[in-house]
From Swiss-Prot:
Organism of origin: Shewanella baltica (strain OS155 / ATCC BAA-1091)
Keyword field contains ATP-binding: yes
RNA-binding among keywords: no
PANTHER family: ANHYDRO-N-ACETYLMURAMIC ACID KINASE
Enzyme Commission number(s): 2.7.1.170
Top-level taxon of origin: Bacteria
Name of this chain's protein: Anhydro-N-acetylmuramic acid kinase
Pathway: Amino-sugar metabolism; 1,6-anhydro-N-acetylmuramate degradation; Cell wall biogenesis; peptidoglycan recycling
Similarity annotation: Belongs to the anhydro-N-acetylmuramic acid kinase family.
InterPro entries membership: Anhydro_N_Ac-Mur_kinase (IPR005338), ATPase_NBD (IPR043129)
GO molecular function, one term: phosphotransferase activity, alcohol group as acceptor
GO BP annotations, alphabetical order: 1,6-anhydro-N-acetyl-beta-muramic acid catabolic process; amino sugar metabolic process; peptidoglycan turnover
HAMAP family: AnhMurNAc_kinase (MF_01270)
Keywords: ATP-binding, Carbohydrate metabolism, Kinase, Nucleotide-binding, Transferase
Lineage: Bacteria, Pseudomonadati, Pseudomonadota, Gammaproteobacteria, Alteromonadales
């Protein structure tokens, strides 16, 4: 069978780099050919972080950063292809998520905004780009997120196996695969790595808490944890999605102001428990037992995985590598898959997950010609 090569590009809310993957979809399961992470230069990262918070002169900065991010994504593709013997002419399309700078689906006129000009990516790589995956779902009354459950369903579902796929990036989201004719469900549970990363960056100038070691050295404060878990988002019914608009450094500082007596490592431990408890609560509402497979950056945080296991005794806990998909690259592979679905004219959203009025082909195509 002829190879079906697609490239997936993903930069999440944690903004810890652009993940690029080359995937072959000609077989029954996606085959990861090669992968690459392109670091986000510090000046660009600062600009993106500024743009994620309301301020003045946003339109000019948005326009510049849209081009800058497009150039960075193109660089990621070109560097990816230097790692393998696949010519750009053999790649059917690039699926680019872009960089989210606003996700506000619950306004009267909801919207989501990802930047990273696909025209720039297409012209600088010579490969057609499929991008802007989320806004069609929002136009149909949906949340525009999460989009990965459709990929999880096709890749990980098995009759008779009750599974939850947990993606822990900046925000955590779950896909419930019931293993029978019941609906697949999925939604954002709340913060994943975003708050634990923000706190260690603020206090220790380190990009992330490696293996959760700093959190492990602290002790969770139950009063602070209770206050954090009282955020209205956690009691919302699904479909629901969230982002930095709700869970950000400004919100965290506001929550911490009555708790300035706490040691810094105790706050880190509490923030990690916020992630774990909010995930576990939502999982137990769906089912108190099953198979749990974790992907995303959180899969490499040993302390996070240990705490999740303690909160979910009815679940077996693994990463998606046990199902044949590297947890580091799972989301990039999902956006390559979304590009394939667009190319084939197939729907890629799950209305039961996003709340959209119907299934739809997602994304628009930007030609390299």
């Amino acid at each position: 069978m002829k190879n079906a090569y697609y490239i997936g590009l993903m930069s999440g809310t944690s903004m810890d780099g652009v993940d690029a993957v080359l995937v072959d979809f000609s077989g029954a399961q996606p085959q990861l050919i090669t992968s690459h992470t392109e670091a986000i230069p510090s000046h660009l990262l600062k600009g993106l972080q500024r743009l994620c918070s309301p301020s003045t002169d946003e339109i000019n900065r948005l326009g510049r950063l849209d081009r800058n991010v497009g150039e960075l994504f193109a660089l990621a593709v070109n560097n990816l292809l230097t790692k393998c013997a696949i010519a750009k002419e053999d790649v059917i399309a690039i699926g680019s998520h872009g960089q989210t700078v606003r996700h506000m689906p619950n306004l009267e006129v909801g919207f989501t905004l990802q930047i990273g000009d696909p025209n720039t990516i297409a012209t600088e790589t010579g490969i057609d780009v499929i991008a802007d995956f989320r806004r069609k779902d929002i136009a149909l009354g949906g949340q525009g997120a999460p989009l990965v459950p459709a990929f999880h369903q096709q890749t990980f579902a098995e009759v008779g196996k009750k599974r939850i796929i947990l993606n822990i990036g900046g925000i955590a989201n779950i896909t419930y695969l019931p293993g029978n004719s019941d609906q697949v469900l999925g939604f954002d549970t709340g913060p994943g790595n975003t708050l634990i990363d923000a706190w260690i960056q603020q206090v220790k100038s380190e990009p992330f808490d490696r293996d959760g070691a700093w959190a492990e050295s602290g002790k969770t404060d139950q009063d602070l944890l209770t206050q954090l878990l009282s955020h209205p988002y956690f009691s919302l019914a699904y479909p629901k999605s969230t982002g930095r608009e709700l869970f950000n450094q400004a919100w965290l500082e506001q929550q911490l102001s009555p708790f300035n007596h706490l040691d810094e490592e105790d706050i880190q431990s509490t923030l990690l428990d916020l992630t774990c408890h909010s995930i576990a609560r939502d999982m137990i509402k769906l089912s108190n037992e099953g198979e749990l497979y974790v992907c995303g950056g959180g899969a490499f945080n040993g302390q996070l995985m240990q705490r999740l296991a303690a909160l979910l005794p009815g679940y077996t806990l693994n990463t998606t590598s046990a199902l044949g998909v590297d947890p580091k690259w799972a989301e990039g592979i999902a956006f390559a898959w979304l590009a394939m679905r667009n190319h084939l004219g197939l729907p890629a959203n799950l209305p039961a997950v996003t709340g959209a009025s119907r299934e739809a082909v997602l994304g628009g195509r930007f030609s390299a010609k």
